[in-house]
């Protein structure tokens, strides 16, 4: 597995934070690093496999990667990211207690992926721009200024995440997408889902297309197919059983959609024939 080292990314041995734009982010094999990373998805979509679990990411997704996590990107579609790298909680001179603003693992579950609305994403871009222009001076005021900007970023992400329970249409769509991540295998009636999240059906279609470039049904199908591919690689369930487990009522239809999405059949994935290009 590829290991990325801080010496190759941080401007100096003492700098606690670095900015790495990926515009766009190409598919990248599984790797980990000796630093922490906040991945901010600017726009378009891709698959983020985080510690072996696949997530569909799109504009507004924020992922918190720790120094022992492993991850990769695949099936990227002009996916644009900004990576905010930081060494460790004890690398800062003026900041303490950062853990209170970061996702925390509880009972083996780590809530690594958050979503923020487009207004917050614009504020994030502005803050990151200030961080990029803050210079690399090592005198106390310069260091303190950079660390304050990083703290402001964490506060903004925390306040803007789903945990804060915002109620505008943008936030409702984020909540809907998080719901789909957990309920993808269920039969989905879009009229009922729109009503559940207090959105009109037209608004749901328009906003999801703006966020992901996909219609609601296409987004749901992709989510199901990603989960199915994970099961094909990491379980002993039959192709038919996996199709049903992931919300497809017909295994032949599932196989057709799967090949169209990934250019491999479910059986190819089960037999590892795609491994040569991973």
Swiss-Prot record:
PROSITE patterns from the entry? HTH_ARAC_FAMILY_1 (PS00041), HTH_ARAC_FAMILY_2 (PS01124)
Q: Carries keyword Ion transport? A: no
Q: Where in the cell is it found?
A: Cytoplasm
* Sites annotated Interaction with sigma-70: 241, 250
Report which residue ranges the record marks as coiled coil. Answer: none
What Gene Ontology molecular-function terms does this entry list? DNA-binding transcription factor activity; sequence-specific DNA binding
Residue range(s) of DNA binding per entry: 191-212, 239-262
Does this UniProt record's set of keywords contain Magnesium?
no
Q: Which GO terms describe its cellular component?
A: cytoplasm
- Domain HTH araC/xylS-type residue range list: 174-272
Gene Ontology annotations of biological process type: positive regulation of DNA-templated transcription; rhamnose metabolic process
UniProt keywords (A-Z) are:
Activator, Cytoplasm, DNA-binding, Repeat, Rhamnose metabolism, Transcription, Transcription regulation
Entry-linked CDD domains: cupin_RhaR_RhaS-like_N (cd06977)
Q: Say what the protein does.
A: Activates expression of the rhaBAD and rhaT operons.
Query: Could you tell me which NCBIfam families the record lists for this protein?
Result: PRK13503.1 (NF010028)
Subunit annotation: Binds DNA as a dimer.
Name of the molecule in the record: HTH-type transcriptional activator RhaS
The gene it comes from is: rhaS
């Amino acid at each position: 597995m590829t290991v990325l080292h801080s010496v190759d990314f941080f401007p100096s041995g003492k700098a606690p934070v670095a900015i790495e734009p990926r515009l766009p982010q190409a598919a990248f094999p599984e790797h980990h690093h000796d630093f922490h990373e906040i991945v901010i998805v600017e726009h378009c979509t891709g698959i983020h496999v985080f510690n072996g679990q696949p997530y569909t990411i799109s504009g507004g997704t924020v992922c918190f990667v720790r120094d022992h996590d492993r991850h990769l990107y695949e099936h990227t579609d002009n996916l644009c990211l900004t990576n905010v790298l930081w060494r460790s909680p004890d690398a800062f001179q003026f900041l303490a207690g950062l853990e209170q603003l970061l996702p925390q693992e509880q009972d083996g579950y780590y809530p690594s992926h958050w979503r923020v609305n487009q207004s917050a994403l614009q504020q994030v871009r502005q803050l990151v721009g200030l961080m990029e222009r803050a210079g690399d001076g090592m005198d106390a005021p310069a260091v303190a200024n950079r660390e304050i900007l990083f703290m402001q970023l964490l506060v903004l992400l925390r306040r803007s995440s789903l945990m804060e329970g915002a109620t505008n249409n943008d936030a409702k769509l984020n909540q809907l997408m998080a719901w789909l991540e957990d309920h993808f295998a269920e039969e989905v009636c879009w009229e009922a889902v729109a009503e559940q999240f207090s959105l009109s059906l037209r608004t749901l279609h328009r906003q999801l297309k703006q966020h992901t470039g996909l219609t609601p049904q296409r987004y749901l199908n992709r989510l199901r197919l990603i989960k199915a591919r994970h099961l094909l690689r990491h379980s002993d369930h039959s192709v038919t059983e996996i199709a049903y487990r992931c919300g497809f009522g017909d295994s032949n239809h599932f196989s057709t959609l799967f090949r169209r999405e990934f250019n491999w059949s479910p059986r190819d994935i089960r037999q590892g024939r795609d491994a040569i290009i991973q």
